[in-house]
Structure formats: C-alpha cells, structure tokens
Amino acid sequence: MVIAELRNATKRFGPVTALAGIDLEIARGQLLALLGPNGAGKTTAVRLLLGLAKPDSGAARVFGRDPRERDARTRTGAMLQVGRVPETLRVCEHIQLFSSYYPKPLPFAETVRAAGLEGLERRLFGRLSSGQKQKVLFALAICGNPDILVLDEPTAGLDVDSRRGLWRHIRSFVARGGSVLLTTHYLEEADALADRIIVLSEGRIAAAGTSSEIRQRAAARKIRCITSLGDTEIVAMAERVSVRRDGVFTEIFASDSDRMVRGLFAQDPGMHDLEVTSAGLEEAFLAITEGNS
C-alpha cells in the first residue's frame, strides 16, 4: 500500500529548478532514503510531502490526500534540519505539549521508551547533549503516533554512538509497520537502514533501487590507477563508465573492468599503480552524482 508519493513533481524557485518532474513513492513499512549532494532537491521533496510547499506541477499525496489536509498532517511526524524548541522547557513538557496537538497520541511512557529518553524526562532541553537533543526531536516526531515519519538528516552532527542509537529507534518504528522518508548525507546510514534508495542530482532522479542495485547501477568494479589518459578518452572505451580524480590517481567505475583494463593498457602502456576492487555504496554514489552533473 502506498502511503506517500510524488508524481511528476516539479518545483522552481525563480530561475532555479529544484525538482524536475520526479516520481517517488513510500509503501507501508518501508524506509526510503533520499541521497544527493547539497542542492540536489532532497529538502524540497521533503517540504512537498509535508505540505510546506506546493509543487508547480505534478502532485504530492499522503494517504491519498493533499499533505496540507488535517487528516494527512495528524498521521505524519517530522524531524527537520531546522527543528528548534525552547531550551527552558523540560523534556517531559515538550513531549506533553506536542502530544496535545494530536487526536490519538502515544502514551507518554511509550514515547520516552521509543526515543531512548529514560531518565531524562525532567531534564531541561538546554542542558542536554547534542545526541540527547536529537532524541527529543525524534520523540516529538513520533509522539503523535504517526503512520509515516519524515526525517531530514536526523543524525547530522552526531557522534557514531548517538547516530547508531537513533538508528535503533528508527528501525523499531519501521518494524512496527511505520513508513519513513529519510534524507541523509551518510552513505553508511542509507546502507544500514533503507529498503530502497533514490539518488537525486540537480533535481532529477539519477538512480533508484536497493543498496546493491545502486552499486550495480554505478558500476560493478572500481579501477584505480595513474594514467596519462583524459576523462573523455576513458569514457569512450566502454558503456556505463564514470571517472573521477583523486590527486594523481584516476578512479574509473566500469561494469566490465577486464575490458576497461585491457583498453587502458592498449592506449597507455605507461599506466601504473593499478588496483581493481568492488565499488562501495559511497563510491557508487559519487560516480552517479558526478556523472550527472
């Protein structure tokens, strides 16, 4: 069952096209991750699905409704990059206040437990660590007992332990049948959490699929070497080839690495420091986004 979707959604800000006719959908119990460099359109997609902005063309739907309608809003929880709450209120006061906005909120104790806030209920928000503050913002996103969570870079700036702790709570929400739209800069995060990944580049979908499918979409193998050949010469050797530079090294992503290596040696007998490895998700992501820029 589709919970939320964008259909041929386009959004412009003056001369800038933030989204150019994209399609995406989130099913019940699914975590969809949006990846992309700054300016790729991730936050714009989030704003459309939350009803904070309206597409110039196409449609945004949550539970089959306009996301600005009350029924859609009360079934949606959000944790945004710009989220701020008063630092002089206690954790329990924030949760109680936000819960009052919803018709069927989670019980207070369940919200605290689901966000990992046990023992912090009486603490002033301003006295919390960065990781604890993110847990509170996550609690405010789930306290209304939503069917879908929209999380815009929820672990940005957190240390590894805090990040992994929040991952556990997100996984628990999905395991209970919730749906999640997650934007992130952390490739490891998408790899660990997402059922499906969409890579955005300049407002368009550059790739979509599971983590393994994204790696295959970019290339099966990474060839790293020092060569005198230019990018244009390398790309012309085979189909589905991406190139990027790392200092004196050239990194080539190719689905047929054997053919590519033979071609490199044929055109540049002086090539050296050759290494062929499997492409990871981060490398696939870079190859896709740089290849579409």
Name each region found by the language model.
Residues 167-255:
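ABC transporter nucleotide-binding domain
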Residues 72, 210, 233-234, 260-264:
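Hydrophobic side chains in well-ordered alpha-helices
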Residues 7, 63, 226, 275-277:
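Solvent-exposed beta-strand sheet faces enriched in polar/charged residues
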Residues 255-293:
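C-terminal coupling/interaction segments
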Residues 4, 11-182, 187-188, 192-201, ...:
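ABC transporter nucleotide-binding domains
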Residues 1-10, 291-293:
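ABC-family P-loop ATPase nucleotide-binding domain
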